[in-house]
Amino acid sequence: MQRPLIAVLIASAFLTLNAQAADLIQVYQQALANDATYASARSSLVAGEERIIQGRSGLLPNISASGSNLRNNSYNSGPDTVFGIVTDSRTKYHSNAYTISLAQPLYDWNAWQTYQQSKLVQANSEATFSQAQQDLILRVAQAYFDVLTAQDNLTSTQAQKVATTEQLASAKRNFEVGTQTITDTHEAQAAYDLVVAQEFAAINDLDNKRTALAVVIGKSAGELAPLRTGVTIEPPSPAAVDPWVSSAESQNFSVVAAGLNLEIAKREISRSRAGHMPTVNLVANKTHQYNTGVGQPGNTGNNTAVGVSWNIPLFSGFAVTSKVRENIALEDKARNDLEATKRQAAQIARQSFLGMTSGLAQVKALEAAEVSSKSSLDSNKLGYQVGVRINIDVLNAQKLLYSTQKDLSKARYDTIMNGLRLKSAAGSLREEDLQPINALLQH
């Protein structure tokens, strides 16, 4: 009765552990809330949204109010103009003045180009943020599958350790009864020592991968949902590389941002040339002033002025011409940056496509190799028992099987990641693309 009860408890604990394991979508949601790099990009987007308001302000009226309140105290001494008698006079009064001014640009090429440029700056911030969103998806998925890869490596290494331990014990028993030489024992001991060292390395690698995931999600990572056994990874659609490369050269968000940087550079040239152009403003102001105090008769005055002001720059020490040349060079730089970004995006798309297609073939080959390796191990174990195989044959078969299993799991993860990188390079990666991958996990 106790053994079935223990089995039920173990099974329940296993199911509870899986129920608590976080899947890829849940980890991504944690990263959305806690990743510092993504939060920085979001703040940059909010800041960029203010640029249009700032750029438009140069085309709108500028209204200001000013005023003064002065206390005047004057003393005069001199002969009276009628009787010639020296007299003193003292005057104390307050003078007050208030002015409201308005200036509306009628022609300001610099302000207009600044406004047009602000639209491009905002669009650039949006493209940069979209790229940051894609980068977050890639970083989360990469960190997630890095942890799974490390876990699989550790599991395989520990299984290999158990098998090697059994083989070492068998070699020692056979040596004691005289059916095998000490060489078999030494070979098994060497294999055991090696797998113990590999286990320590695998444990350390798993800790490092969990730490890397914690950096993205902002807290220690718990249990993660593993990939289901024998999953089928969908091939890329379209199945040709050229459409992906074409999309990467035009729709990749880094390419879009670089193109906007080029347009911004062109507008900057126009802005700098505005230093040679006149500015015309409609101006209006109204002034009200009055005086009060002892010895100063109260008086009030109002003045209203409406007209046009203009300014024509004549010479600025060649600063404007130099600024134009500088911005022309920066425009050329932006054009070259755009071309370099296009080439890089196309290269990533091509590499990711080839990596995914070759990865699918590699997964299929490794699945067949795993079956063959298991059969080889079983055959070598049987041959060892009947005396037609030696200990090193079994050890090599074990090593081949576990190495194949490690390669197979890594090939699956790499193929999935290449699919995500391919969509990112083409500018089409979205949060929804994690759903089919999440469905491959064991929930």
What does each of the following model-derived ranges do?
Residues 135-247, 355, 359, 400-402:
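Periplasmic alpha-helical coiled-coil/stalk elements that build and connect Gram-negative outer-membrane
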Residues 20-68, 74, 221, 227-263, ...:
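Bacterial Sec-pathway N-terminal export signals of envelope proteins
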Residues 1-20:
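Gram-negative bacterial Sec-dependent N-terminal signal peptides
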Residues 26, 95-99, 142, 187, ...:
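Transmembrane beta-barrel architecture of outer-membrane proteins
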Residues 29-39, 46-61, 99-117, 127-134, ...:
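A glycine-/polar-enriched beta->alpha junction
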Residues 40-55, 132, 136-155, 166, ...:
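Amphipathic alpha-helical coiled-coil segments
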Residues 66-104, 227-238, 270, 283-316, ...:
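Small/polar, glycine/serine/threonine/aspartate-rich low-complexity segments that form flexible
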